Amino acid sequence: MSWLEKILEKSNIVSSRKASIPEGVWTKCTSCEQVLYYAELERNLEVCPKCDHHMRMKARRRLETFLDQGERVELGEELEPQDKLKFKDSKRYKERLAAAQKASGEKDALVVMKGAVLGVPVVACAFEFSFMGGSMGSVVGARFVRAVEAAIEHNCGLICFSASGGARMQEALMSLMQMAKTSAALERLSDKGLPFISVMTDPTMGGVSASLAMLGDINIGEPKALIGFAGRRVIEQTVREELPEGFQRSEFLLEHGAIDMIVDRRDMRQRVASLLAKMTGQASPLVVSVNDAPNEVPYAVPEANKKG
């Protein structure tokens, strides 16, 4: 103990100024655990600038950063889930829906928008994984069919960003029926000669991967995305064999021909726009910086609290 500490009590030795860091300014990469400035991460489309790990992205933000500004019209937002079976497990289905809606800010697990990407008309939809694991229920199926119908009506392509754990067990057979319903809708789109591009993000599993996600004219995976039907442990217990490392990652699927390409999220707008233009006989879109988000806004660093 120093001579000063002997004279003064520690309780009386305080800092003249107490600084505080506002919430939401910093975050940590879920892969490399690097501490990141959140505004920089947002500008980088939530891809870690240190290790290129693709973090999970909110459905609405994904569509807003993918589609051109001023061209977006949401479809099917009036559709809301209903508890027709009065389902109850450890909680009532109604309670789970209310909690998911509050946590995610969405009415259900799929967001659909009509717009354009680099000037190429498209209908785009994205799964919201934070809404009950992106599970597919009646509203998800209905909104996806609405997206297909809009693509047919406007004679344009359809793209879907999948992020789902599969069918929603609380809706039982009505949920499983959405696998057939969405697949039949995509058949109608194909009959019209219109393209469907499926982008599988982390994770795309269960009934979604077994239906609409794998039915693209072109199937794209984001880097290191988990894509499959059943989980690794379930499969190993069934076949009683040890499976290869990373066998459900997009790189493994590309190597074995299950998907067509892997595209970095920052390159997605340019790549998809070029594919859609070629598949619909339109002029190739202008090449732009892949880091330009269409709704980029300046970010001011909040001042630290000066009260001490």
Swiss-Prot record:
GO terms for molecular function: acetyl-CoA carboxylase activity; ATP binding; carboxyl- or carbamoyltransferase activity; zinc ion binding. Zn(2+) binds at C29, C32, C48, C51. Pathway: Lipid metabolism; malonyl-CoA biosynthesis; malonyl-CoA from acetyl-CoA: step 1/1. InterPro entries: AcCoA_carboxyl_beta (IPR034733), Acetyl_CoA_COase_Trfase_b_su (IPR000438), ClpP/crotonase-like_dom_sf (IPR029045), COA_CT_N (IPR011762), Znf-ACC (IPR041010). It is found in: Cytoplasm. It catalyses: N(6)-carboxybiotinyl-L-lysyl-[protein] + acetyl-CoA = N(6)-biotinyl-L-lysyl-[protein] + malonyl-CoA. Residues 25-294 form the CoA carboxyltransferase N-terminal domain. One of its GO terms (biological process) is fatty acid biosynthetic process. Its EC number is 2.1.3.15. Its main location: cytoplasm. Keywords: ATP-binding, Cytoplasm, Fatty acid biosynthesis, Fatty acid metabolism, Lipid biosynthesis, Lipid metabolism, Metal-binding, Nucleotide-binding, Transferase, Zinc, Zinc-finger. Signal peptide: none annotated. Its cofactor is Zn(2+). The keyword DNA repair does not apply. Binds 1 zinc ion per subunit. A zinc finger (C4-type) spans 29-51. Pfam families: Carboxyl_trans (PF01039), Zn_ribbon_ACC (PF17848). GO terms for cellular component: acetate CoA-transferase complex. NCBIfam families: accD (TIGR00515). Acetyl-CoA carboxylase is a heterohexamer composed of biotin carboxyl carrier protein (AccB), biotin carboxylase (AccC) and two subunits each of ACCase subunit alpha (AccA) and ACCase subunit beta (AccD). HAMAP family: AcetylCoA_CT_beta. Belongs to the AccD/PCCB family. Component of the acetyl coenzyme A carboxylase (ACC) complex. Biotin carboxylase (BC) catalyzes the carboxylation of biotin on its carrier protein (BCCP) and then the CO(2) group is transferred by the transcarboxylase to acetyl-CoA to form malonyl-CoA. This is Acetyl-coenzyme A carboxylase carboxyl transferase subunit beta. The gene is accD.
